[in-house]
C-alpha cells in the first residue's frame, strides 16, 4: 500500500518532464545539442556562429530525426522555398495539369479577314517561350485568318495586377530573374541583345533575339579596330524611357577582336512585349494588322479561333527546380490562387491561402511559414527546417514522388548542382534544391547515402557572409556526413 501515493507522483513527474520536453523552449535547447563534428569544424573555419545555422536530417520511414539543430527557428530559405511551391502545385493540381492561351474573334471572318478585334486571353502559361509563341501564331494563321482589321486586345486578367515594380527587389529591373508574373508572359519578357563587329563597314551591327515589332534599338556603338582588351565592358546598355519603355540604347566602344557579344535583358511591359512579338511573328507568317494593341476583357460573344496548350505541370516543375526559375515559380504560385477562387483574378493572398490549406490537409502546420511570392526571391519569406523537411517527407510518400524527385537538381549532373558534389561516389546520388541570396545559403532535398538509405536533408544558413563560401562549405561537410550514414 506504500506504493499507491508514489505511482501518481511518478506519473505526474513523467508527464511534467514530457510536457517540458515538448515545450518550445526545451525543444530549442535540445535542438542545439548535436551537430556532426565535421559540420561544427566547417562552421568554425568559416567563422559562422551556430545561431545563424539550422539543420534537419531524417531518414525516410523513421520517426526521429538524426540531426535537429535550431530546427524551429524561422529562416529565409531563398530558392529552396520552390520545394514548397512545386510540391503543393504538383499534389493539388496534378502532374498532367496544363495552361491554355486562347485567341478569339469579336467579328466575322470573311475571305481571311477578321472584321473586328483579335482577343488574346492569357491563361498564366509559365513557359511561353518564343518558339512556343511562334507555334501559337502559326496555329492561329492556320485557323484561316490573314488580316486582323481591328485591334489586338490583350486580356491578362487571369492574374490580378501585382502593383510591384520589376526593380523592387534589388533595383536591377533589367535582370531576367526579376521578371514579374503576367497571365500572358511571353519569352519571360526577355530579349538577347547581340552585337557583331563588321570590319567591312567599320561598324557594330546590333540586333535583338527575339525582336518585338514595337521595340526600338538605338545603336551608337563605335567599332575599335584591333585586339579585344575590355570585352563587353565598353558597351553601355540603357533604357532611356525607363525599364518598361519600348526603347533600348547602346553606346560605347567595342573592339573588332571581341567577336560576337550578347546579353539578355528583361524589357518593356508584359502586354507590350507579347503584342510586339505577336506582331513580328504575325507579319513573318504573312499576316497584317489594321489597328494597334490595347488591354481589355474578353467579350461574352467572342468566338474561339485557336487554343494553345502549355507543357504539363510535371514538366514545368522540373524547369522551376532544376534551373530555379523565379517567374515560373511565381506563375505556379498564382495558378494555385486562381484555382482556389475560380472566375476571380488570382492574387498572392489567394495563393498563400491555397498553399497553407494544402499543407494543413497534409498535417503540416507550418505556423512560421511566410510566403511572399513562392519563388524565394524575397527578403521576407520564412520557413523553418522542420517544416521544409515535413514537405519533403510528404513528397517522398506521395503517389507523385517520381515526378517530384525528378524535378530536383541531380548532384554533379544537371541544373544548379551540375558542378557540385563531384566526388565519383556522390554523382547522381543527391536530389536537392539550392538557394542563394545575399546573406542566405540553403540546400534541401534527398541524399541517397552509400548505405542505400535515403535521408531528407535540410540546411539553411542566414548570415552576412552566407553566400560568399561559408554556406557551401557547411553544406559540403553536412552532406558528406549524411552520405556516410
Where are these regions (language model features)?
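Bacterial N-terminal signal peptides
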Residues: 10-22
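Residue-level preference for non-acidic, small/hydrophobic
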Residues: 63, 82-89, 152, 184, ...
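Positively charged n-region of N-terminal signal peptides that target proteins for export
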Residues: 3-9
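Conserved serine DD-peptidase/penicillin-binding transpeptidase domain
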Residues: 28-43, 92-366, 473, 481-485
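Short active-site loop at a secondary-structure junction
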Residues: 68-88
Amino acid at each position: 500500500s506504500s506504493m499507491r501515493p508514489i505511482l501518481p507522483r511518478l506519473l505526474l513527474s513523467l508527464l511534467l518532464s514530457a510536457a517540458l520536453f515538448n515545450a518550445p523552449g526545451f525543444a530549442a535547447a535540445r535542438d542545439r545539442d548535436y551537430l556532426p563534428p565535421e559540420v561544427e569544424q566547417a562552421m568554425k573555419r568559416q567563422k559562422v556562429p551556430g545561431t545563424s545555422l539550422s539543420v534537419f536530417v531524417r531518414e525516410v520511414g523513421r520517426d526521429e530525426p538524426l540531426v535537429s539543430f535550431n530546427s524551429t527557428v524561422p529562416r529565409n530559405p531563398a530558392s529552396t522555398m520552390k520545394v514548397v511551391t512545386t510540391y503543393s502545385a504538383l499534389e493539388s493540381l496534378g502532374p498532367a495539369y496544363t495552361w491554355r492561351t486562347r485567341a478569339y474573334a469579336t467579328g466575322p471572318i470573311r475571305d481571311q479577314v477578321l472584321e473586328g478585334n483579335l482577343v488574346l486571353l492569357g491563361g498564366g502559361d509559365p513557359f511561353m517561350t518564343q518558339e512556343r509563341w511562334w507555334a501559337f501564331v502559326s496555329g492561329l494563321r492556320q485557323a484561316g485568318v490573314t488580316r486582323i482589321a481591328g485591334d489586338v486586345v490583350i486580356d491578362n486578367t487571369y492574374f490580378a495586377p501585382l502593383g510591384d515594380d520589376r526593380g523592387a527587389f534589388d533595383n536591377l529591373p533589367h535582370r531576367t530573374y526579376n521578371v514579374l508574373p503576367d497571365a500572358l508572359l511571353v519569352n519571360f519578357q526577355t530579349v538577347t541583345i547581340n552585337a557583331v563587329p563588321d570590319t567591312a563597314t567599320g561598324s557594330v551591327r546590333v540586333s535583338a533575339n527575339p525582336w518585338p515589332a514595337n521595340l526600338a534599338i538605338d545603336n551608337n556603338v563605335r567599332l575599335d579596330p584591333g585586339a579585344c582588351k575590355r570585352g563587353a565592358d565598353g558597351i553601355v546598355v540603357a533604357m532611356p524611357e525607363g525599364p518598361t519603355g519600348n526603347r533600348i540604347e547602346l553606346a560605347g566602344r567595342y573592339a573588332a577582336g571581341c567577336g560576337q557579344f550578347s546579353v539578355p535583358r528583361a524589357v518593356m511591359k508584359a502586354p507590350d512585349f507579347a503584342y510586339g512579338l505577336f506582331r513580328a511573328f504575325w507579319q513573318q507568317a504573312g499576316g497584317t494588322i489594321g489597328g494597334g494593341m490595347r488591354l481589355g476583357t474578353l467579350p461574352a460573344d467572342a468566338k474561339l479561333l485557336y487554343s494553345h496548350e502549355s507543357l504539363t505541370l510535371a514538366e514545368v516543375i522540373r524547369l522551376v527546380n532544376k534551373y530555379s526559375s523565379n517567374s515560373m515559380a511565381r506563375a505556379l504560385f498564382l495558378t494555385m490562387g486562381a484555382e482556389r477562387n475560380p472566375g476571380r483574378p488570382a492574387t498572392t493572398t489567394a495563393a498563400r491561402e491555397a498553399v497553407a490549406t494544402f499543407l494543413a490537409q497534409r498535417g503540416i502546420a507550418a505556423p512560421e511559414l511566410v510566403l511572399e511570392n513562392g519563388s524565394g526571391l524575397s527578403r521576407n519569406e520564412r520557413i523553418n527546417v522542420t517544416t521544409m523537411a515535413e514537405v519533403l517527407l510528404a513528397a517522398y510518400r506521395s503517389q507523385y514522388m517520381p515526378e517530384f524527385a525528378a524535378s530536383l537538381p541531380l548532384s554533379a549532373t544537371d541544373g544548379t548542382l551540375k558542378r557540385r558534389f563531384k566526388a565519383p561516389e556522390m554523382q547522381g546520388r543527391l536530389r536537392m534544391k539550392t538557394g542563394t541570396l545575399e546573406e542566405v545559403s540553403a540546400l534541401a532535398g534527398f541524399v541517397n547515402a552509400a548505405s542505400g538509405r535515403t535521408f531528407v536533408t535540410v540546411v539553411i544558413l542566414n548570415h552576412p557572409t552566407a553566400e560568399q563560401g561559408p554556406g557551401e562549405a557547411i553544406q559540403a561537410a553536412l552532406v558528406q556526413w549524411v552520405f556516410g550514414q
